[in-house]
Amino acid sequence: MPKVKNWQIAREMNYPYPDKRPKKQIAYIFDTNKCIACQTCTMACKTTWTAGKGQEYVFWNNVESKPWGYYPLGWDVRILNLLGAQKWEGGVYAGKTIFEAPSKPEEILGYMPDERDYASPNLGEDECKDIIIDVEDHYIKGPVHNNWGFYLARICNHCTYPACVAACPRKAIYKREEDGIVLIDQKRCRGYRECVRACPYKKPFYNNTTRVSEKCIACYPKIENGEMPQCVTTCIGKIRLQGFKSRPDKVRKNNPMDYLIHVKKIALPLYPQLGTEPNVYYIPPVHVDQRFLKQMFGPGADKSVQLYRNAIKDKELIGALTLFGCTQGIVDTYRVEGDHTIGFDEKGKEIVNVPLTEPVFVRPAKIEATGAYLYNNT
C-alpha cells in the first residue's frame, strides 16, 4: 500500500492511493464556543439539498449534543472502540489509523450502521443526565461525568485522504482537483454502501428510493461563484468560516484559514487519529474536560483553549476570528488596519470591513433642535 504524508498526525501512513493533493483545498472552521444548536444550518442544508424522497433521515449537516449525542447513533464511540487504545508521543501519532489497523483482507477499518441508528437525528437532546445507566450493549458506559456539554456541528470533512474514495469498488467517488471537494458520481454508484461502511464520520448516506449513496457537495454551485455554502451563511451564531487552506508547506499568513489552522493552531481537526486528514476544523470549547478534548481534537487542544481564552490580547487573532459570519463571500486574504479587519477575495477586491470591537453609541437625552427629551422604553 502506498505511503502518504499526513501532517495532522505528523508522520507518513498507509493509504490505498498515491499522495496527490488538489490545487487548493476547501476547508471550514467551526467555533464550538458559540454554537447554540439552533439547527438553522441543519434546516438550511435540509431544505436546499435533502428534501426529496428517500432523504427523510439524510442530514448532510447535523448538530450533535456532546458528550452523549450522535448521528448516526454512537458513530464516534463505535469507531474508536474498533480502533482500540492508541497513543500520541508528543505531537506525533504513534498509534494506527483506520487504514493501518484492519487485518487482511480488509483495507479500511469500519462498520455498517444499523438502520435504527438513524432513527433520531439528535435534535434537542442536550440535557446532561444525573444518572447514566450502565447496561449490556448500551452505548453509554462509565462513571457519571460532571455537568458539562457542548454542541458539535458536523458536515462532510472533504478529507485529504477520504476513506469513502478508498473504499468504493465502482470508483464512483472522487476528489475535485480544483477545490478538493469530494463528490459521488451517482451514475457510477450502484449502492453497495462501502462508502457508508468505510467513512469513520458516517457522512455518506444511502437513499433507499434512488438506491445510490449521497453526501454533502459543499454547495459547490455557490463555491464556484465565490460564495460560502448554505450552512455557513445561514448560521445565526456566526460560528462558521469557509475558505481554502494552503498546502502544509506553502502556508500564507494573510489567509485566515491558514492563519487559524497552521500558524496559530487554534483550529483543530476532528479525530485526527483516524487518519483521513479531515478539512473541517474546530475551535474546542473552553469549559470541557481536557481529556475529552484531547481524545476528540488531538494533543493541541490545551494550547487551543488557552489561545482562545487570551484572544482579546492578540489583534491578529481577533482580526481573523471577527471574519466569522460577516460576509457571504469567500475571504482569500485579510489584514488588520487600526481597529478594523478587512477581507479580500481571490482577485484582491475588498469584500468585508468590520470593527474588531462592536462600537457603542450613546444617544443624547435631549434633541437640541426641537427641545424634545428622549426616553427609553426598555
Residue ranges and their predicted role:
Residues 1-378:
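Non-ligating segments of multi-cofactor redox enzymes
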